[in-house]
Amino acid sequence: MRAVVQRVAEASVTVNGEETGRIGKGVLVFLGVGPDDGSGDIRYLSEKIVNLRIFPDASDKMNLSVREVGGGVLVISQFTLFGDCRKGRRPSYAGAAPPELARRLYGEFVEELKKQAVPVATGMFQEMMRVHLVNDGPVTLLLDSRKVF
């Protein structure tokens, strides 16, 4: 399971002109699911994201988590995080989970985040989305539950 995590001042997502999710201060998470992912990957990434100390404290040091600052999490499904661009000019997405599995694990990931006592908003799985965000920092991190990077 892979995630791009961005610290944001605010973020929202629309599908077919309708807003499906919005947060103020918090983190925007683009989530990709791999074919071998499961509950361990969900637990690892959800706990990591909620507890990452990427928000400034009173001394302006990145020392606080999204939970500690009362922020929200906006989760967007993003199978392209498993795109392989090493050969040719068109990415291969063979490394991504099949849609049925990815949909189930995406939903379980969102539910696990909600158990972490943070407000969670989402896009819509397997839909074209417009994501609007205001980066804060910017702070952008790449996470992989298999610790590839």
Swiss-Prot record:
Domain comment as written in the entry: A Gly-cisPro motif from one monomer fits into the active site of the other monomer to allow specific chiral rejection of L-amino acids.
Top enzyme category: hydrolase
Top-level division of the source organism's lineage: Bacteria
This protein's record includes keyword Hydrolase: yes
Keywords: Cytoplasm, Hydrolase, RNA-binding, tRNA-binding
Full protein name: D-aminoacyl-tRNA deacylase
Catalytic activity: glycyl-tRNA(Ala) + H2O = tRNA(Ala) + glycine + H(+); a D-aminoacyl-tRNA + H2O = a tRNA + a D-alpha-amino acid + H(+)
Complexes and interactors: Homodimer.
InterPro entries: Daa-tRNA_deacyls_DTD, DTD-like_sf
EC number: 3.1.1.96
UniProt-listed Pfam families: Tyr_Deacylase (PF02580)
Transmembrane portions of the chain: none
Single biological process term from Gene Ontology: D-amino acid catabolic process
Role this protein plays: An aminoacyl-tRNA editing enzyme that deacylates mischarged D-aminoacyl-tRNAs. Also deacylates mischarged glycyl-tRNA(Ala), protecting cells against glycine mischarging by AlaRS. Acts via tRNA-based rather than protein-based catalysis; rejects L-amino acids rather than detecting D-amino acids in the active site. By recycling D-aminoacyl-tRNA to D-amino acids and free tRNA molecules, this enzyme counteracts the toxicity associated with the formation of D-aminoacyl-tRNA entities in vivo and helps enforce protein L-homochirality.
GO MF, any single term: D-tyrosyl-tRNA(Tyr) deacylase activity
UniProt record similarity statement: Belongs to the DTD family.
GO CC annotation terms, alphabetical: cytoplasm
Gene: dtd
Renumbered ranges of motif Gly-cisPro motif, important for rejection of L-amino acids: 137-138
SUPFAM superfamilies xrefs: DTD-like
PANTHER family hit by this protein: D-AMINOACYL-TRNA DEACYLASE 1, D-TYROSYL-TRNA TYR DEACYLASE
Compartment(s) of residence: Cytoplasm
